[in-house]
Amino acid sequence: MRGEVVHIHLGQAGTQLGNSAWELYLLEHGLTQDGRKDPDSTVAGEGGSYDTFFTESSNGKYVPRSLFVDLDPSPIDEIRTGPYRQLFHPELLISGKEDAANNYARGHYTVGKEMAENVLDRIRKITDNCHSLQGFLVFHSFGGGTGSGFGALVLERLAQDYAKKCKLEFSVYPAPRVATAVVEPYNAVLATHSTLEHSDVTFLVDNEAVYDICRRNLDIPRPSYEHLNRLIAQVVSSITSSLRFDGALNVDLNEFQTNLVPFPRVHYPLISYAPVISATKSAHESFKTSELTLQCFEPNNQMVVCDPRNGKYMAVALLYRGDVVPRDTSAAVAALKAKSSFNLVEWCPTGFKIGINHQKPMSVPTASPADGGLASVDRSVSMLSNTTAIAEAWSRLDHKFDLMYSKRAFVHWYVGEGMEEGEFSEAREDLASLEKDYEEVAGDYNDVDVDAEY
């Protein structure tokens, strides 16, 4: 028994990401769209441990341990009428009557607060059915109203009720040039401020970076959210694969935290995935372990727009899947460390955590190869790296926040929902000190008296 993981999907981004993630899980476990074992599946018998993600019902159906919540009814209605309507427990699809209107304060204080108790009750129901709960994966965006405001509210409550359990976030972060709402910088700064203390590890994804990966590597001229989400789902799946399948080096949720977060506030790793290649091109490529590992460190394979060559790595987790042996991974890491462009901080000499899982990576089949589906490959690697370069992303966000806040633009919408204006400046100060934390970590720690602690 490896422990269960509960998925919580909040807001439109969380819901759509969740849809792609569960689509992939069903494929990996050999289950049909309504959660029964698929007789035609190639993974029959090797479906791994179902218990981690699914509860088995009395009639042999596997029901996901997941909760979908949105204050706006339409994204949840899409699931209720979509291809997976038979899969999810209807009580665990919760939608409100009015949406958060891209307003953090609505999601956190007014509309969201009314739904909070109901949502926490449902979470309690799911966790009561678990033998040994490992933790939570929370999917949401920092830019929307529900994702930021309600997401922060749910994480605050989880931190109270499940203090010892692991809480990992997958957050869609506002992209540098593409914005879906004018007030994204406000929502993101407020949400980051209120979740900093409550989340153990937050994996950031920005849509622009993933768009570029899809355009460049999969030759999709205009990628849709579905293309983006399927790519992100591959990383989500790798993170939990060793809880579900056997491998040479297993990694559980707590290990991410232990190995990736040197200081509690600095918990925003970058993620990247290789190989991202279309089915039409895959015949011309070799996917050696060492090549895939190097691909992960290319700036244009990373899911947040920032340049890791400008920063230093504090810790890196490499999660391999498929036909990979430990000797190859050690050689790949040694080759990496020898490169001059790879900078580790001085105070963390090893810096690498490796996971190996024997389950081959799978991808959701598309109607035609031209649709930009991922090629089926024998091995893949997901990289989670805590690097000081991600401070670039924070400073971009803070700059946008400052431009609007200097004129107090749009602030009345937040104050009108019962939020105090002081919370804006408090949140902004918190992010300024987060940027400072990254600067200090990147600097040498030689001036700190390390012996004083012992």
UniProtKB/Swiss-Prot annotation:
Alphabetical UniProt keywords: Cytoplasm, Cytoskeleton, GTP-binding, Hydrolase, Magnesium, Metal-binding, Microtubule, Nucleotide-binding
GO BP terms, alphabetized: microtubule cytoskeleton organization; mitotic cell cycle; nuclear division; nuclear migration by microtubule mediated pushing forces
Localization of this protein: Cytoplasm, Cytoskeleton
EC number, UniProt record: 3.6.5.-
First-listed, main subcellular location of the protein, grouped into a coarse class: cytoplasm
GO molecular function: GTP binding; hydrolase activity; metal ion binding; structural constituent of cytoskeleton
Cofactor names: Mg(2+)
The protein's enzyme class: hydrolase
Transport in keyword set: no
Chain positions of site Involved in polymerization: E453
InterPro entries documented for this protein: Alpha_tubulin (IPR002452), Tub_FtsZ_C (IPR008280), Tubulin (IPR000217), Tubulin/FtsZ-like_C (IPR037103), Tubulin/FtsZ_2-layer-sand-dom (IPR018316), Tubulin/FtsZ_GTPase_sf (IPR036525), Tubulin_C (IPR023123), Tubulin_CS (IPR017975)
Domain of life from the UniProt record: Eukaryota
Record field: catalytic activity: GTP + H2O = GDP + phosphate + H(+)
Gene Ontology CC terms: cytoplasm; microtubule; nucleus; spindle
Residues that hold GTP according to the record: Q12, D72, S141, G145, T146, T180, N207, N229
Residues binding Mg(2+), per UniProt: D72
List of catalytic residues: E255
Function field: Tubulin is the major constituent of microtubules, a cylinder consisting of laterally associated linear protofilaments composed of alpha- and beta-tubulin heterodimers. Microtubules grow by the addition of GTP-tubulin dimers to the microtubule end, where a stabilizing cap forms. Below the cap, tubulin dimers are in GDP-bound state, owing to GTPase activity of alpha-tubulin.
Self-association state and partner proteins as the record states: Dimer of alpha and beta chains. A typical microtubule is a hollow water-filled tube with an outer diameter of 25 nm and an inner diameter of 15 nM. Alpha-beta heterodimers associate head-to-tail to form protofilaments running lengthwise along the microtubule wall with the beta-tubulin subunit facing the microtubule plus end conferring a structural polarity. Microtubules usually have 13 protofilaments but different protofilament numbers can be found in some organisms and specialized cells.
Protein family (similarity comment): Belongs to the tubulin family.
Name of the protein in question: Tubulin alpha-A chain
